[in-house]
Amino acid sequence: MKTATPFRLTLLIPGGLALLAGLDSALLLLGLPAPLTTNRLADIHGPLMVFAFLGTLIALERAVAHGAWWAYLAPAALGAGRLVALSPLPLLVAQGLIVGGFGLQVAIYRSVWRRHQQIYLAIQTLGAASALGGALLWLADVPVPRLVPWMAAYLILTIAGERVELSRLARTSQRPEQHAFWIALVIFAAPALALISAQWGQIVLGLGLLGL
């Protein structure tokens, strides 16, 4: 335990740096003085905050819960992606690391699913798959504004899955869980629909949020 704790704290450092970089890029977007200025920092504000900061924290929490050594590669890859994004290295390298990190996060959920086939895990897996889809689109040079529905679905479904997990203690029926799963599928489909029609994607995402 004494050995594991410093290791986990080390993995938190890139996430904390991603938060600071995200706040720095927010100042740049507002046209205010910022401690750090680079050519691409303001352009990657969204991915820094969602993929690098929140993604690292969520992946680390999942890795700790899973317990396997390879699960820690997910937060490590996401944190490394953040460090590379702020370095002179090509952004493509950072994007590749983030894609790998979310691919591993999906693998973590799949591994847990084999042992515990629960609806809340399915919802969280949909969230991780949304992040992976968004990261792949970012790697394919899709503009960041078009990634917003994917990043939103990642956070919404992750939080929804955790809420379903916590509420299981007070429920005697599975119907609310099943309802949450079908709503999660709607939210999961919305970003893909937004690639075809931004308006309809927003409408479907809004309906999904109302359903929650």
Across the structure, where does each feature detected by a protein language model lie?
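Hydrophobic alpha-helical transmembrane segments of multi-pass integral membrane proteins
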Residues: 1-212
